[in-house]
UniProtKB/Swiss-Prot annotation:
Membrane topology: Lipid-anchor
Keyword field: Cell membrane, Isomerase, Lipoprotein, Membrane, Palmitate, Rotamase, Signal
Organism: Listeria monocytogenes serotype 4b (strain F2365)
PROSITE patterns recorded: PPIC_PPIASE_2, PROKAR_LIPOPROTEIN
InterPro entries: Foldase_PrsA, PPIase_dom_sf, PPIase_PpiC, PrsA_foldase, Trigger_fact/SurA_dom_sf
Lipidation (N-palmitoyl cysteine): C22
Lineage: Bacteria, Bacillati, Bacillota, Bacilli, Bacillales
GO cellular component, one term: plasma membrane
Protein name: Foldase protein PrsA 1
Amino acid sequence: MTKLKKVMISVIAATLLLLAGCGSSAVVKTDAGSVTQDELYEAMKTTYGNEVVQQLTFKKILEDKYTVTEKEVNAEYKKYEEQYGDSFESTLSSNNLTKTSFKENLEYNLLVQKATEANMNVSESKLKTYYKTWEPDITVRHILVDDEATAKEIQTKLKNGEKFTDLAKEYSTDTATSTNGGLLDPFGPGEMDETFEKAAYALENKDDVSGIVKSTYGYHLIQLVKKTEKGTYAKEKANVKAAYIESQLTTENMTAALKKELKAANIDIKDSDLKDAFADYTSTSSTSSTTTSN
């Protein structure tokens, strides 16, 4: 889960805010002496200070310009629930996260995405160029196993008439989809493992099953559920635009957008210990705008 580290920073940020200025009250007492709130605050600031002040500052700046609704956060949260299936809650717990803290980070990420979108120049010519290689979303089921021998065993059972959905429930190691017969959410080009995606798009008719596909995750058998024929540019423009914007939400473009927002906010760092917190966002060496993309 790529966003868990940032969620941890959100939790630490909240702790630092609570500790700031608390003074000499002890948080831990021992016969050898006490650990005070001030000592804890300074230690946390030394270790996490730059990352925490970045997120707190950017959140303040972005909330002044952009709005993220509870509905948007919940929709994003649901994606992770579906992606991780039965292991979602244990994944949060193992990273010392709660539903609330994870949603707070999702809200922050959505703010950054909106700032990045606002910094894009989505021209007609760029969309038409993107349309040439764009394909509509495809829906498939899959069975994931660890070894080729098991995949061949499943392949034989399919040829003998056993149902794909039943075999997915029995064999698939993808716990997020196995209970649902291996059904994946619709996806488009560039969203999945390259070899998996190529094999999925090569399927032509509903219920067609691929050969054994080796990906970075293991061995797959893929069954086509739904494949929509690509329409004209005029018909598909809204879908093309959404996919194009999604493709441009890269680290480079997000950083460029945050640099622009930071410059406009006239930031003044008062704590000398944090003077370098925004060094990566005030340098002029990297690309200054997402408008050069595609």
